[in-house]
From Swiss-Prot:
Catalyzed reactions: tRNA(Val) + L-valine + ATP = L-valyl-tRNA(Val) + AMP + diphosphate
Coiled coil: 816-882
Location of this chain's protein in the cell: Cytoplasm
Biological process terms in GO annotation: valyl-tRNA aminoacylation
Residues spanned by motif 'KMSKS' region: 539-543
Identification of the protein by name: Valine--tRNA ligase
Subunit structure: Monomer.
Function: Catalyzes the attachment of valine to tRNA(Val). As ValRS can inadvertently accommodate and process structurally similar amino acids such as threonine, to avoid such errors, it has a 'posttransfer' editing activity that hydrolyzes mischarged Thr-tRNA(Val) in a tRNA-dependent manner.
Description of its domains: ValRS has two distinct active sites: one for aminoacylation and one for editing. The misactivated threonine is translocated from the active site to the editing site. The C-terminal coiled-coil domain is crucial for aminoacylation activity.
Cellular compartments per GO CC: cytosol
SUPFAM superfamilies on file: Anticodon-binding domain of a subclass of class I aminoacyl-tRNA synthetases, Nucleotidylyl transferase, tRNA-binding arm, ValRS/IleRS/LeuRS editing domain
Length: 882
């Protein structure tokens, strides 16, 4: 933009990420680059940010997800799309209410001391004071979201959407109230969703006891359970219909030892006749499998616990006991009657625990509100079957269909105060009415006290954030959203629910634009990423102590380094293992790019029209041809959400080809007065920085502005085909030159010659190998000088190339300090031995081999092999120096 500017002075001598990144991000936001305009005539591209919990902070999984979404939106913006990346946060019902209740408890208060309305005001106060941490973290990562549209799932607009769809589902008969089994938290006093339950292996006891006769003289059946207290609610005993041992008992009954109740013996396919005694106790009100058996056989469903997990209403001596105390008391009472057959302690089994409060959840029969999912799940499944929504990778499709084709009705009510209040009102005589957003409840009626599951409102996120149920320009421009980026671990919990609700309202006038387009799905693509694991391949968890705060790495290495590490490891559906060494390597990559650009600018790199191809050097034609190949590779990778492939291609081109070779060759060309070299340097850097920008936006912005003087990479054009094909003849010459230089450098290293120490040399076979044009490059990059009249070769290197063999004769006499070289080699040998011992010990550790993922073991084996080769090479060199 400014002809008189001095690009080299626009850059500091080194890159300081913390200071530079903050200033650059502020410039982007102030310039409005991320603000979406629904009135634009550009094609629309939109992504909704999976809303993080308002109580939380961004973890490494968020950082991965945000990096990929930011990369996609930045690229599309550069490709000429009107881009909306919609930010927002989830109200996180249970988590948020728990945080505020804990704050009240510090002062000895409970939410009941304030009442519902005052307590909710306190939650809003907390949200306003403490709910902004995530926004700051997103800015540190470089998220290019439209902050002007930041949403919250409890905003009035989103609340209206919740009430609207609830009313429509209710009127369609798809929401109903019923007593069914739920995950119940006795501590939180509410039902929980499946995702709020963590399963942990615990040591318990397996108690086998007899129903019926105490000896073998009369009818009896032995059953086993880890929750013996639930036998107070048993209403049947189930056996397999083909089990000959019990066939004569099916249809009869056995008495309950503590209550006046007969237990019906039923035949059910669910029972595994090979497991245990082949008979199971059936407690329909306290076990999911038993509940299904109870429905099939129309069994009584007797709840034996109150909401706090205490035995209640059984009419036994156990009433009032905590469930765990009752477990001991019931076992002792059975033993006193002589009914205990066997007790296994410890017995390791999986038990569901409340994610938030930590206690074992209690499957419990409870009166709740439910969504009838059969037709909704079918529509969600059909959207993928019909290709309206494409799941990436396609290998995840079977899991998707297995879930949506066998989905159970969804419990959507929660016994909380914080959340979307269920819009059902009750009259004085038991009347019930669903009140829509534009309706007024009758005078004197009372609203249902429960709130909706957090997942209910987040299921509306793709269209509620765009203004639904109103008709808005945003819905017209940006809906359906282009892609959903999320973890495969919540494919069913969140993605399926968004698909169900999205297809349910897909033919709504606000979405079809009054019929101007057909029914829509919430997103065109679903990209599922894997989980972040530590460098040993273990899942990150607080209990393992291996959780890493992404901002710690941002502070240490910069946001670009973290982003490149995550994107480079991200393949569709695959988990990625990362450690500090990976981020340090990415930081080094950024430094390499910075130094190469700074060198180019200091040497006059400037964008200009390139001369005809036949006037370019072999090196020029090679780097420009490779650049075009990499551009096409990166485009293909991004189009298929293959972030790892894109980053690997860019990394190896930038480091191995451009920085390590072309920049060095450019120095030779500039020394020879080849003036167009500066234009080739600038052209290559210009395209490379544009291609890298979606993943490492900060450093590329600074470098590109210094290179071009233009406003911002954010709004620059994405590279298009240059039309420059890879020149095969030039490429072969460069390949041969690289091999020749590499072999000479390896020989020099083995001889103990210092880098850049000039050595007289004579080359033979150059013309026959078609390398006449590369002699100056070989001489410069291999640190050789011309052989003088007194040249006496002391060594030679033969390098077989495609067109022939080049012999390099060298005079190394007097160039080596033998004693110093021995000291250096001995030091290197000690390091190689240490690495060899370390890797060998790891590979001999059976526990490590059993637990570590295959790719981690392979890396250790590679390190062991390299250490062995290095040790052998050094020993050979030491032998020569004897």
């Amino acid at each position: 933009m400014t002809a008189s500017r001095s690009p080299a002075t626009d850059l500091p001598k080194s890159w300081d990420p913390p200071a530079a990144e903050y200033a650059i991000y502020r410039q982007w936001v102030d310039a409005g680059y991320f603000t979406a305009n629904p009135a634009s005539d550009k094609p629309g591209y939109s992504i909704v940010l999976p809303p993080p919990n308002v109580t939380g902070s961004l973890h490494m999984g968020h950082a991965l997800e945000h990096t990929m979404m930011d990369a996609l939106t930045r690229r599309k913006r550069m490709q000429g799309y009107e881009v909306l990346w919609q930010p927002g946060m989830d109200h996180a019902g249970i988590a948020t209410q728990s945080v505020v209740e804990k704050q009240l408890a510090v002062d000895g208060k409970t939410k009941e001391d304030f009442g519902r309305e005052l307590f909710i005001e306190k939650v809003w106060d907390w949200k306003r004071e403490s709910g902004g941490a995530i926004g700051g973290q997103m800015r540190r990562l470089g998220d290019g979201v439209d902050w002007s549209r930041d949403r919250f799932t409890m905003d009035e607009g989103l609340s209206r959407a919740v009430r609207t769809i609830f009313k429509r589902l209710y009127d369609a008969g798809l929401i109903y109230r019923a007593e069914r089994l739920v995950n119940w938290s006795p501590v939180l006093q509410t039902a929980l969703s499946d995702i709020e339950v963590n399963y942990e292996e615990v040591e318990g006891e397996l108690v086998s006891f007899r129903y019926g006769s105490l000896d073998d003289s009369g009818p009896h059946i032995v059953v086993a359970t880890t929750r013996v207290e639930t036998m107070l609610g048993d209403t049947a005993i189930a056996v397999h219909p083909d089990d000959e041992r019990y066939r004569h008992l099916v249809g009869s009954s056995l008495p309950h030892p503590f209550v006046d109740r007969q237990l019906l013996i039923v035949a059910d396919e669910h029972v595994d006749p090979e497991f245990g005694t082949g008979a199971v106790k059936v407690t329909p009100a306290h076990d999911p499998n038993d509940f299904e058996i109870g429905l099939r056989h129309q069994l009584p469903m007797i709840s034996i616990m109150d909401t706090r997990g205490r035995i209640a209403d059984t009419g036994t001596q156990f009433d009032g006991m905590d469930r765990f105390a009752a477990r001991v008391a019931v076992r002792e009472a059975l033993a006193a009657q002589g009914r205990i057959v066997e007790e296994k302690r410890p017995y390791l089994h999986s038990v569901g625990h409340s994610e938030r409060s930590g206690e074992p959840i209690e499957p419990r029969l409870s009166l709740q509100w439910w969504v009838r999912v059969e037709s909704l799940a079918k529509a969600a499944g059909d959207a993928v079957r019909n290709g309206d929504t494409v799941i990436h990778p396609t290998s995840m499709e079977p899991r998707w269909f297995a879930w949506v084709d066998d989905m159970h009705d969804w419990c959507v009510s929660r016994q909380l105060w914080w959340g979307h209040r269920i819009p059902i009102w009750y009259g004085p005589n038991g009347e019930q009415r669903c009140v829509g957003p534009d309706e007024t409840p009758p005078e004197g009626w009372e609203q249902d006290p429960d709130v909706l599951d957090t997942w209910f409102s987040s299921a509306l996120w793709p269209f509620s954030t765009l203004g639904w149920p109103e008709k808005t320009p945003e819905l017209e421009k940006f809906y359906p959203t282009s892609v959903l980026v999320t973890g495969y671990d919540i494919l069913f919990f969140w993605v399926a629910r968004m698909m169900m609700f999205g297809t349910f309202v897909g033919d709504d006038d606000a979405i079809t634009l009054d019929g101007r387009r057909g029914p829509q799905v919430p997103f065109t693509d679903v990209f599922l990423h894997g989980l972040i694991r530590d460098e040993s391949g273990r899942k990150m968890s607080k209990s393992k102590g291996n959780v890493i705060d992404p901002l710690d790495w941002v502070d240490m290495f910069g946001a670009d380094a973290l982003r490149f590490t995550l994107a480079r490891g991200a393949s569709p559906g695959g988990d990625l293992a990362i450690g500090e060494d990976h981020v340090r390597a990415s930081r080094n990559f950024c430094t390499k790019l910075f130094n190469a650009t700074r060198y180019a600018l200091l040497n006059g790199a400037q964008l200009a029209e390139l001369p005809p191809l036949d006037e370019l050097t072999d090196a020029d034609r090679w780097i420009l041809g490779r650049l075009e190949e990499v551009r096409a590779e990166v485009d293909s990778a991004f189009d298929n959400y293959e972030f790892s492939r894109a980053c690997e291609s860019l990394y190896h081109f930038a480091w191995d080809e451009f920085c390590d070779w072309y920049v060095e060759l450019a120095k030779t060309q500039l020394a020879e007065g080849i003036t167009h070299t500066t234009a080739v340097l600038a052209t290559t850097l210009d395209t490379l920085l544009r291609l890298l920008h979606p993943v490492i936006p900060f450093i590329t912005e600074a470098l590109w502005q210094a290179l071009t003087g233009n406003e911002s990479l954010v709004i620059a054009d994405w590279p298009r085909s240059s039309g420059i094909d890879l020149d095969q003849v030039a490429t072969q010459r460069i390949t041969d030159m690289q091999k020749l230089v590499t072999e000479v450098r390896r020989f020099r290293s083995d001889q103990g010659l210092a880098d850049r120490q000039k050595v007289p040399a004579r080359l033979a076979g150059v013309t026959e190998s078609d390398l006449d044009t590369q002699v100056s490059a070989v001489t410069s990059l291999a640190w050789l000088t011309d052989a003088g009249p007194d040249f006496r070769p002391s060594a030679s290197v033969e390098v077989r190339l495609r067109g022939g063999t080049v012999v390099v004769e060298l005079d190394t006499s007097g160039s080596i300090d033998v004693a110093a070289e021995r000291r250096r080699l001995e030091k290197d040998l000690a390091a190689a031995h240490k690495e060899l011992a370390s890797t060998t010990a790891k590979l001999a550790n059976e526990d490590f081999l059993a637990k570590a993922p295959p790719h981690v073991v392979d890396k250790i084996r590679d390190r062991q092999r390299l250490a062995q080769e290095e040790s052998e090479r050094i020993n050979a060199r030491l032998a020569v120096l004897q």
